[in-house]
A protein has these predicted regions:
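N-terminal Sec-pathway targeting helices
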Residues: 1-17
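Beta-rich carbohydrate-recognition and catalytic domains
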Residues: 22-56, 61-109, 115-266, 270-321, ...
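Active-site pocket scaffolds in enzymes
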Residues: 324-325
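Hydrophobic, well-ordered secondary-structure elements that form the walls
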Residues: 328
Length: 376
């Protein structure tokens, strides 16, 4: 009798849990999007890729009169051997042709980054073998025409370092931020050909430091942002934040500060009108189970002003759920941004977005509008 009663109580608890979770899923599926897009940006938006897959991890460049877009295509956010990188090309950023698909045998592939160095297009990507993505190495391939690509080349001298996006100030020397595959340290490298890299020094150590982006200030100094995860708890961490670092040439001594406006995941930095901006992931609301980086919180792809001592949120882009990891091109007084997002009519939490369809979105922003919303 006692066992029977215990079994009944157990099943009652299971039913309550099932009903509660079902109610939560139903609410999430109906919740309308609350992105705050500044109307002064006069955004034009369209889906570059919408094919039912979980598309993610984008980058964008303009080379030889054409836009090049690359993104990951997978069943979901997590690591899988079937993931591929799709390279597309367009003259207007609206009508895209598929140029090539990249894969690595028996491995997951993600976080592609373009560089145009010495009239050659170089593509850096990260290799991953875990279901919960933890990339462990960087490889590269290159092309002289955007169509024919070399075999994958291992960066054995920098094994374990995960490359982000290189930048140059003089067109000769390129600088590459990279973070350690086990998290916690970011460094700066330099190169003249994009293939052979020399270690410049450490940017930052601590707080599960990873995705690190750089840009040059007008006076030649370098500014850097990095994703600081803190403890990396699935429900977020109040110590999660964005590192902002500034250094004079030769970029070996860094002045550090932290911004708690967001934990800037998937950052891309760019300059316009003597200001530095970032496009990255925004965590708009902090709560008990929705601290910085929580899988239960809403996410946005947003634009920020990056100052030497702080981040300033300027506007969301139309986005929701699993989103961010963008690329940018500035052309003809317009800012073109690619990024990925779940259904922008909804407002999924991050965890639901990870297993849902996500599209590659393009937006066109009049730079005059960006200037207008930027604090002076």
């Amino acid at each position: 009798m006692a066992l029977s009663k215990s079994v009944k109580v157990f099943f009652i608890y299971i039913l309550i849990l099932f009903f509660s979770f079902g109610t939560l899923l139903f609410y999430w599926s109906l919740r309308r999007n609350r992105s705050k897009v500044n109307p002064e940006l006069n955004i034009k938006q369209w889906a570059a890729v919408s094919d039912g897959l979980h598309n993610s991890n984008t980058d964008l460049t303009f080379w030889n009169g054409k836009f090049y877009l690359i993104h990951a295509a997978s069943p979901f956010h997590f690591g899988t051997e079937v993931c591929r990188l799709v390279l597309r090309r367009s003259v207007d950023a609206k009508n895209w042709e598929t140029v090539k698909e990249f894969q690595i045998k028996n491995e997951d592939i993600r976080d592609p980054k373009f560089a145009i160095i010495n009239n050659k297009m170089i593509l850096y990507v990260l290799k991953n073998i875990g279901f919960d993505p933890e990339p462990y190495a960087t490889v590269l391939t290159s092309s002289l025409n955007g169509e024919d690509w070399t075999d994958w080349e291992e960066l054995k001298e920098h094994e374990g370092w995960l490359f982000w996006r290189p930048k140059t100030h003089d067109g000769k020397t390129w600088y590459m931020p990279a973070y350690w595959w086990e998290h916690g340290t970011s460094i700066l490298l330099k190169s003249t050909d994009g293939i052979k890299w020399e270690n410049v020094g450490i940017i930052y150590e601590g707080l599960k430091n990873d995705e690190t982006a750089i840009e040059f200030l007008p006076d030649g100094r370098m500014i850097c942002t990095a994703r600081l995860e803190g403890t990396g708890n699935y429900f977020g961490d109040l110590t999660g934040c964005t590192l902002i670092s500034v250094s004079n040439k030769p970029y070996t001594n860094w002045k550090q500060t932290k911004s708690y406006v967001t934990r800037l995941d998937g950052p891309v930095l760019f300059s316009y009108n003597n200001k530095v901006y970032a496009v990255g992931r925004y965590h708009p609301k902090i709560g008990f189970l929705t601290k910085q980086g929580s899988i239960l919180s809403r996410k946005r792809t947003s634009i920020f002003l990056v100052e030497e001592d702080k981040l300033i949120w300027l506007s969301d882009l139309p986005s929701a759920g699993d989103t961010s990891y963008g690329g940018i091109v500035i052309k003809d007084n317009y800012l073109y941004v690619c990024y990925y997002t779940n259904d922008i009519r909804k407002d999924f939490p991050w965890v639901l977005g990870m297993i849902s369809q996500s599209d590659i979105m393009m937006v066109e922003i009049d730079l005059t509008g960006l200037k207008e919303i930027t604090p002076t």
